[in-house]
């Protein structure tokens, strides 16, 4: 019976939340509103609570004055060694008092991961929530053909050998699950009448004291509904996220994409097996539906040399390196500067380091490629490609701007290193040579 008392507490708290939901009706009409559903006077029902489904241990009735009265079911003391739990019933029964099989109520069963579950049956789902904590577990229930799953936070255990119980995914200490449902009277919770003349909430003499009740209830994010309720992590147990699985489709207050769970309003880039993360497509979880759209990059940028960054779909304008002193015309001490790009690729134990210079005359990009294995230069060559082709190479990053004179110094030193590093290990020589391309600020701003 572990967890049933907690579920009933959730129901009573939810009834209190429902008390704030009222509608103007005529005096001649008397009915009860509960979970956005109308009930006639005298009508009885079991409340519904995700992810547990119908709570058979709580009975609700619509009274003559329009109040919703919910009470816990009082289970009798059984005088048998092995009581049996019956679906659709709160209290267990002794085997000799079970009804015949042909009188069993027929309800829709549920299908989940190749297993069929009967209405009211609880089970554990592994791998449903990817971001669950070590003290959390996924508990599901079957209710009228729908599978309701929730992430439940388990209480801290104070024993060395916890045991499993049939009605909860959380393990408990032996004896903790044997909760007593023996009460002198049923606990009753009232909801104000749904009439034009409003009634304030009246506590029944059977209701538990406020201090006792508040201590065992989770804090809800809002008072409109229990859907999407966020449970305090310090509470003993509770549901953080609900997922409703109807047939083979998942829906509820979350979206599931590529094995990951996203809450309403959360955005992400889809991860396709053949392409990896698609940076230029953005998906957003809209209650239960994934809405994906293509990101359109601007045709013009406020800077002359926008930069492609890893993890970004569109190019961005880089911040100008603070150590350089360019004037408004993109020159350094009267000499024109050109952008320098760099890329480092590692594959099969080889490192390819590329340094590229973009020139206006001629309009091309000169790429110097170094292929290094175990610190020794294996291959060196120079490529000249068009700006259009270079624009499609997203692994290059803008590192600085340099002048043609500095680039010539770099090329001369590069020729010397290509001979020297082909026969011995060169670890810092190329890195030191690249520093030649960085322009130093002249003293007192004089060239």
UniProtKB/Swiss-Prot annotation:
UniProt GO cellular component terms: extracellular region; plasma membrane; synapse
Keyword Nucleus recorded: no
Pfam families from the UniProt entry: CHRDL_1_2_C, VWC
Entry annotated with the keyword Repeat: yes
UniProt KW keywords: Developmental protein, Differentiation, Glycoprotein, Neurogenesis, Osteogenesis, Repeat, Secreted, Signal
UniProt motif (Cell attachment site) ranges: 174-176
Annotated region described as Disordered, given as residue ranges: 199-219
Domain called VWFC: residue spans: 30-95, 108-174, 253-318
Function: Seems to antagonize the function of BMP4 by binding to it and preventing its interaction with receptors. Alters the fate commitment of neural stem cells from gliogenesis to neurogenesis. Contributes to neuronal differentiation of neural stem cells in the brain by preventing the adoption of a glial fate. May play a crucial role in dorsoventral axis formation. May play a role in embryonic bone formation. Plays a role during anterior segment eye development.
Protein name: Chordin-like protein 1
Species in which this protein is naturally found: Rattus norvegicus (Rat)
